[in-house]
Amino acid sequence: MPAQEQELFGLPQVLINFRTIGTTAIKRSAMGIVAMILHNEEKDEIKNYTIRDVSDIPETGLTADNVDLIKKCLLGTPLRILVYTLPMSTVDGATHTQANVLRMLANIKWNWLCAPTATTQEQQDLASWIKTQRPTKRKTFKAVLAEQDADHEGIVNFCTNDIKVQTDTDVLGNPVYTIYTAVQYTARIAGILAGLALDRSATYFKLTEVESVEVYEDIDTLIDKGEMLLIDEQDGDGVKIARACNSLTTFTTDKGEEFRKIKIIESMDMIRDDIRDTFKKYYVGKVINDYNHKMLFVSAVLVYFSEIKGNVLDADADNTVDINEQYQSNYAKLHGDDPTTMSAMEIRQYNTGDTVALAGSIRLVDAMENLTIDFTL
């Protein structure tokens, strides 16, 4: 009995934590972490750096081009950048590869991945890795890659080239420009997406440092193909992100058209991480897995849902979570019991060992992006 009382006494912490993470959701959503992979080393080795601002960039050890890419990422104000440096392509017989870095990244916390010095093959390998990590490992990793037709909600396919940016002035005070490729500017885009709060979309986000970009004949068709592009509409507003879309173009009943919106995927990932992290911190190994404790956890999740209504969840929708009765029924059948002879409550209360199976329905809110007006005069 004392142990049971102690467990029950500790449960209010879960409610407090869910309420806290709910009220801080927008602020926390603007503090994403970027993982950046760079070819930099002249020896067969991997180094890593944690960069929170420009003062963290080492004075030696990184090439000038790589320092520039890190600074471009910092413009988006991510919480921090986890920089991993690989051998340059000129290092003969190098054994340290991108695969080694991915093994390091697999079990740490970050949000957006970019590799602005990667080869086409390395970009393809990153796309394959993200596609594996999200469904099978239940990770919320995402990547900004260049010209990768990945058809996946976790991968942004950035395709704008000829990105003209003033990077210096000459002795006469005239501007000196650098032309960036799409793969190089994935660093900038990853920084933007990591530092952007969920109270807005990245659509029409201004890149004030960019002077001009390539021009498209039919940008709508390209966006429909899952390409994220920069555009200058020559309206005096400068260069901006045309549409905050990921590379998903194949839609199903499980993944509808809303899954192509970066804001929607970011919201889903934040909810998954918040619930999973709280479960690990307050429940795993600490709470008896009976019906009452399951329902206490359900109540805590509902409190969290109530706190993120508005900018994350649709305030007018019925956002719910409950015991997964289908899982409970299947579990009972697998363990030799006949669920057809059981009442609904008996199925809900069936002992599922160390597993908590919940089912829910939520409606995520998007930012305004399209305007349709029909005037009748």
Language-model segments: residues:
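Structured, hydrophobic secondary-structure cores that serve as assembly/anchoring elements
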Residues: M1-L69, L74-P78, R200, E227, ...
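Short, surface-exposed beta-edge/turn micro-motifs
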Residues: M31-I33, K109-N111, T140-F141, K225-M228
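Extracellular Cys-Trp
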Residues: N66-Y204
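Long, low-complexity, intrinsically disordered N-terminal extensions of eukaryotic proteins, enriched
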Residues: D170, V210-V213, G238
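Acidic, serine/threonine- and glycine-rich low-complexity intrinsically disordered segments
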Residues: F205-L222
